Regions:
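N-terminal cap/lid segment of alpha/beta-hydrolase-fold proteins
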Residues: 1-22
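Short, surface-exposed "cap/lid" segments of acyl-processing enzymes
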Residues: 20-54
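Conserved alpha/beta-hydrolase
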Residues: 50-72
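Alpha/beta-hydrolase active-site loop
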Residues: 79-99
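Alpha/beta-hydrolase fold nucleophile elbow
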Residues: 100-111
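Residue in the alpha/beta-hydrolase core beta-strand immediately N-terminal to the catalytic nucleophile
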Residues: 106, 129-131
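Short glycine-enriched nucleophile-adjacent loop
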Residues: 114-125
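Accessory cap/linker subdomain of secreted extracellular hydrolases
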Residues: 133-192
Length: 192
């Protein structure tokens, strides 16, 4: 377990170390969207457990952790923002980098975890390296539009259903592009 002191929570996780003498290169695995446990378990499959096992057998130390408010981690998942999840990942990275068994430390982020990896790489406490697995390679608004269109198609809804709410979503995107996050959050709270 490690602390995110800025959030006042403890996050539970598993650190796997390779056999032999360290220090070892090390990674933090950061999950995609949705409340995920440290194995990123979905429908009985545990991709982060499999990835951690492979990396560890190949000489890389791996920290994987339960998202805040999920499984054994403290916090409230439902009210957390992308910045909160980035803060959790940064705390994990600091904890891992401080361990005597580790050398260069980085992030492997899956999907939304890839976005978090980009955020940390551009921040003040940048990891030594990042890997983005299925993280977006286009601007977030473009990604959201395409994701929404694909979800509508997969649900079997007609094109008219997609277009029906398109204007509202485009307006929301325009607002978030135009105004700083704190301004939008304050004004949304005033509507509640």
């Amino acid at each position: 377990a490690f602390d995110n002191s800025a959030a006042g929570i403890t996050l539970a996780g598993t650190l796997t170390l390779p056999a032999g003498e360290g220090p070892f290169p090390a990674v933090v695995l950061v999950t995609g969207s949705g409340a995920q446990n440290r194995d990123e378990e979905l429908l009985g499959h545990k991709p982060f457990l499999v990835l951690a096992d492979w990396l560890t057998r190949n000489g890389i130390a791996v920290l994987r952790y339960d998202d805040r408010g999920t499984a054994a981690s403290e916090g409230d998942y439902a009210s957390a923002t992308l910045q909160d999840f980035a803060s959790d990942a940064a705390s994990a990275l600091r904890w891992l980098a401080a361990r005597p068994e580790t050398a260069a430390t980085g992030i492997i982020g899956h999907s939304e975890g890839g976005i978090i990896a980009y955020m940390l790489a551009g921040g003040g406490e940048a990891p030594d390296f990042i890997v983005s697995m299925a993280g977006p390679a286009v601007k977030g608004t473009e990604f959201m539009r395409e994701q929404r269109r694909l979800i509508t198609e997969r649900m079997g809804l007609p094109e008219s259903a997609f277009r029906q709410n398109e204007q509202m979503v485009e307006y929301m995107i325009e607002v978030t592009d135009r105004y700083p996050y704190d301004y939008v959050e304050t004004h949304l709270d005033s509507l509640a």
